[in-house]
Structures are given as C-alpha cells and as structure tokens.
Amino acid sequence: MTQDPSSQISWSQTIVLSIVQGLTEFLPISSSGHLRIVSELFWGKDAGASFTAVVQLGTEAAVLVYFAKDIAKILTGWFRGLFDKKQRGFDYRMGWMVIVGTLPVSIVGLLAKDIIRDNLRNMWITASVLIAFSFVFIAAEKWGSKRRSFDQLTMRDAVIMGCAQCLALIPGVSRSGGTVSAGLFVGLDREVATRFSFLLAIPAVLASGLFSLPDAFAPDAGQAASGMQLAVGTGIAFALGYASIAWLLKFVGSHSFSWFAAYRIPVGLLVMALLATGMLTA
C-alpha cells in the first residue's frame, strides 16, 4: 500500500520539531505542548504522538549520558543489595524508588494511550493547561520548604512524584514541571527534586519511545517518518537535550521555577488568541 505523501513528515518538520524537542523536553514548559503548537502554527497539522515519543529517545539518551555515573552507581548498589542484605544502602533504596515511581505513569500510559492520542492533543487543552499549571509552579515555590537533601529521599516521595509524572501525559503540563512541583511540595530541595525527576523519567520514556517505534513509520494518527528522519531527529534532540540538562541544573540552583510560569502564561494566552481568531486550528 502506497503511503499518502501528505501524511509523510517533511525534513523541515523533522529538523524544527527535533530542535524544539531537544530545547524543551527538560524545561518545565511542556515539550509535547510546544511540539503541538509549532506543528500546527507552521504546518497546520500534528506530527503525531508516535513521532514525539520516538524523538524523545534522543533526549532520554542525553539523560543516560549526563547521569551515567549516578545511574551506574544506583544499578550496582541495587543488584548488590538484591543478593546481599548487608549491602542494602541508599543506592539500593534509590533503585527501588525509581522502579516504584515509574509504575504509575507506565500503567496509566498503557491504559489511556488511545484517550491521550485521540482526545487530549487538542490545542485548547494545551493552552489551558500551560496557563493553569503555571500556578502550580508558583504554589510549589511558595509553600514547599525546599530543605531536604538527596539522601533524604523516601519511597513516599517517589510514589508522589511518580503519580505527578502521570500528568505529563497531558500536553501542556510538562514532565519535569509536574514531578519537580510534587517534589517541592513534599519539601525537597529544588535541585534534588530536579535531579530525581530526570532519573524517574528514564524508564517510562525509554519504554514509551521503543513501544511507539513501529507506529512512527505507519501511525494510526499523525504523520509517518522514515528511518533516516527518526535517526536525525533523535540525534538533534540528544545534543540539545544534553545542553538543556546542564543549563537547567545550573539555573535551579539559584532561580525559582516561577520564572517558567512567567513564560508559560503568555504563551498559553497567545495560543488561545490564535485559536480564537482562526489562525490556529484545535
């Protein structure tokens, strides 16, 4: 069966959307929301959730490389602890915290895949959530104590942040925004919440990207991409994602997440205005 040319993603889309993915994936401004906005604004069509999920593999590879030492330490401690109770230290517990914290989004993502793809990728929803969730950032900064260090992380924190990660399935929320806000609410230091947010995202996003790989070539919704386009897009997302991680960790050391709210609210209002005037379609 011949693929309809109009349903094939273009190279310009591939490059631009991969740049957007790399720059926004780790910032609390919603990469999925920005991809949706840019796709509609410049091409009048949605590239699709499958393309997004696969290109996310590039940004998640950036996390693996950036936190390679931390990940190796956690994995080593976890495996040692499985076979020797005397070696069940913090890294062993951290391994379980990442696993348990990943379960909520894995379950919800699988069960609600069709609902997310068919009903939640609406531009009005994206714009509304960009605005509404900005006030969650502000509240988390205002009422979170931000005192607890990395070695004070608990399984309760992992469960709460893991549940918050489910909100990232809605375009406009932001994976890091949801999990970091939850971390701030339970009293974690801003940088601690951000670092754990990155670690927590790895299993779920890698699984989502690999699971969506076949669908990206012939999607039920959105546009199809070639293997070369997916490879180039993933590479671009990796390079920019790595730089974005380094920048964000430095930024949160001395700046409030409320700065991102100051960006999200005008963007959400602008999108609503474009929708209302017919310059964008929902």
UniProtKB/Swiss-Prot annotation:
Subcellular location: Cell membrane
Predominant subcellular localization, coarse grouping: membrane
Disulfide-bonded cysteines: none
Gene that this polypeptide is encoded by: uppP
Top-level taxon in the UniProt lineage: Bacteria
Membrane topology: Multi-pass membrane protein
Pfam families found in the cross-reference section: BacA
Catalysed reactions, semicolon-separated: di-trans,octa-cis-undecaprenyl diphosphate + H2O = di-trans,octa-cis-undecaprenyl phosphate + phosphate + H(+)
EC numbers, comma separated: 3.6.1.27
Function: Catalyzes the dephosphorylation of undecaprenyl diphosphate (UPP). Confers resistance to bacitracin.
GO cellular component: plasma membrane
Name of the featured protein: Undecaprenyl-diphosphatase
Keyword terms: Antibiotic resistance, Cell membrane, Cell shape, Cell wall biogenesis/degradation, Hydrolase, Membrane, Peptidoglycan synthesis, Transmembrane, Transmembrane helix
Annotated organism of origin: Corynebacterium diphtheriae (strain ATCC 700971 / NCTC 13129 / Biotype gravis)
